[in-house]
């Protein structure tokens, strides 16, 4: 007896899943790319975010709300997305001001969201691609060749994203170190991988010591917005070998990496201090 509308902005909802949700509860409105299979399943395609926020009672998306979206939210609207309230107090205030009912996707269950797993795995693969000399990398082979050692990789953060990246890189033969602030997480990963990975507490001094010998860094840390006590400073990046790779999966402005700036799919790489 419950009727509402449901929208996905960036999450990949499969056509069968869309069909099931339509039959049970919802009319699905999707605002990414048009797909006949979604239409066949009963999804409604729209062209603008304004249409979505203006008509949907339940809004689900992947990333945090952008400031341009704050004014589109309506009182009583239910929203479900990654909010990361500790890192985005201004977003929390906007949700309170608009009087919406908000659920933090990242805290909805202990196993995290599939998009976090996808980001970790794809980030690892993008890092390996960037290591190729044709992309400016040092050309080191992930698992090593003959008498040549494999890549040394540092993963910042042992959460869902970091664990997904670790699964890919360990399977391919990389020498991986995971840094996290939770010793319980590190112990669990050590046991899971039968002591075949290195772990350490994530702080600047520990990272500084191993960075010169590290071939690739993956940042999987959600950093408090505005905190400029970077885990990796520009000066630390200078200690890495030219052609080394940093993959910032967290993608936070003023995040854990001082040298971060946004990129596009068309031009995803840039060079800072030779890295």
Task: Show the residue positions of the predicted features.
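Rossmann-fold NAD(P) dinucleotide-binding segment
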Residues: 61-86, 212-213, 226-246
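Short glycine/serine/threonine-rich phosphate/pyrophosphate-binding segments
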Residues: 160-166, 184-186, 225-231, 254-257
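Glycine-rich phosphate/diphosphate-binding loop of Rossmann-like nucleotide-binding domains
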Residues: 1, 23, 27-36, 134-219
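Short amphipathic, helix-prone segments within low-complexity/disordered or flexible regions
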Residues: 2, 6-20, 24-28
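Glycine/serine-rich phosphate-binding loop and adjoining beta1-alpha1 elements at the start
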Residues: 65-151
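Rossmann-fold NAD(P)-binding glycine/threonine-rich loop
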Residues: 86-107, 235-275
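A structured beta-alpha segment of the ubiquitous adenosine-cofactor-binding alpha/beta core
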Residues: 42-57, 64-65, 199-217, 221-238
């Amino acid at each position: 007896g419950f009727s509402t509308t449901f929208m996905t902005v960036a999450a990949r909802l499969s056509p069968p899943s869309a069909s099931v949700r339509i039959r049970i509860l919802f009319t699905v409105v999707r605002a990414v790319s048009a797909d006949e299979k979604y239409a066949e399943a009963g999804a409604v395609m729209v062209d603008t975010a304004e249409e979505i926020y203006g008509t949907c009672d339940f809004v689900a998306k992947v990333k945090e709300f952008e400031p341009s979206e704050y004014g589109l939210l309506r009182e009583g609207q239910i929203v479900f997305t990654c909010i990361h309230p500790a890192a985005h107090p201004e977003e929390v205030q906007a949700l309170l001001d608009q009087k919406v009912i908000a659920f933090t996707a990242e805290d909805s269950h202990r196993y995290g969201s599939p998009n976090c797993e996808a980001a970790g795995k794809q980030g690892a693969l993008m890092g390996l691609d960037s290591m190729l000399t044709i992309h400016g990398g040092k050309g080191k082979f992930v698992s090593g060749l003959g008498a040549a050692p494999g890549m040394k990789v540092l993963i910042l953060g042992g959460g869902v994203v970091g664990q997904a990246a670790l699964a890919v890189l360990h399977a391919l033969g990389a020498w991986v170190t995971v840094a996290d602030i939770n010793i319980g997480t590190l112990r669990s990963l050590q046991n899971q991988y039968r002591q075949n990975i290195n772990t350490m507490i994530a702080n600047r001094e520990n990272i500084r010591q191993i960075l010169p010998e590290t071939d690739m860094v993956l940042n999987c840390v959600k950093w408090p917005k505005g905190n400029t006590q970077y885990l990796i400073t520009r000066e630390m990046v200078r200690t890495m070998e030219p052609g080394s790779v940093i993959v910032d999966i967290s993608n936070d402005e003023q995040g854990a990496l001082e040298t971060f700036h946004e990129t596009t799919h068309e031009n995803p790489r840039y060079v800072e201090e030779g890295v």
